[in-house]
UniProtKB/Swiss-Prot annotation:
SUPFAM superfamilies: Class II aaRS and biotin synthetases (SSF55681), tRNA-binding arm (SSF46589). Binds 2 magnesium ions per tetramer. Gene3D superfamilies: Bira Bifunctional Protein, Domain 2 (3.30.930.10). It comes from the Bacteria. Keywords: Aminoacyl-tRNA synthetase, ATP-binding, Cytoplasm, Ligase, Magnesium, Metal-binding, Nucleotide-binding, Protein biosynthesis. One of its GO terms (molecular function) is magnesium ion binding. This is Phenylalanine--tRNA ligase alpha subunit. It comes from Ectopseudomonas mendocina (strain ymp) (Pseudomonas mendocina). The gene is pheS. GO terms for biological process: phenylalanyl-tRNA aminoacylation. Tetramer of two alpha and two beta subunits. Mg(2+) binds at E252. GO terms for cellular component: cytoplasm. It is found in: Cytoplasm.
Amino acid sequence: MENLDALVSQALEAVQQSEDVNALEQLRVQYLGKKGELTALMQTLGKLSAEERPQAGALINTAKNQVQDALNARKSVLEQALLAEKLASERIDVTLPGRGQTSGGLHPVTRTLERVEQFFTHIGYSVAEGPEVEDDYHNFEALNIPGHHPARAMHDTFYFNANMLLRTHTSPVQVRTMESQQPPIRIVCPGRVYRCDSDITHSPMFHQVEGLLVDEGISFADLKGTIEEFLRVFFEKPLGVRFRPSFFPFTEPSAEVDMQCVMCSGKGCRVCKQTGWLEVMGCGMVHPNVLRMSGIDPEKYSGFAFGMGVERLAMLRYGVNDLRLFFDNDLRFLAQFR
């Protein structure tokens, strides 16, 4: 035990002179490890008498604790110095210009949907929604679409089974509304619809807004005035509008609505194929069979319905010539609509 004090002094001096954490670890192993110098002294206790052994063991443990405390203290000092050096080297240069933040914006389809809804809610319509996974009855049968109609073909409709499908229009929402309430009914039905079609002007998923008004004494003149006013407000300028006779199973009479080309003001251009007119929606008076199947008396009530593609309206309003741009998630395109 004669050299215990000298060994402790040597260890403490080495600890204080160490310059990094790795050196401290080597000193810990040298003095306190399994084969360390202070640990080795514990093995000499067996050579001492029973009376000397407790006192000698206590001295060795005190020495080990003293060295361990010195190691811990020095390690803390070195770690603080290392942290300070790291912070100094990584400090932020506040004189550099900031990166800034890019503000987002509404998608052009969302903007168009909101614009359509805003017009119709201002004139007394309410917004109605329904399921996108629809049954055959509400999507076809209740709308007077017979079993042999081409729209029911597999190449036009996404079927889950013989009775369930992805809705091909938002008209089922109109049927469900008429089934659940009696006239007067004034609703617009925005939402996603699905068809087996994909090209420059068609997408397998797109958005529609359909409208329905059912009440006593409703005529085609009411439909005509509503659509003309909507197009004037939506495009923010007076436009020529014409109604061409057409056929839809759920309306009679039916019409396609054309408006004066917004690109050339009706003079003829590539967009309107030199006709001066653009097709924008379909419409008509609700077929008596549709009213009857929904539980509404067609002898007492009449109504009109219309439907338009939201992407089609957005393309015309913003001058976009490819429908697929709306779904490509290209920020260079979308950033134009902030």
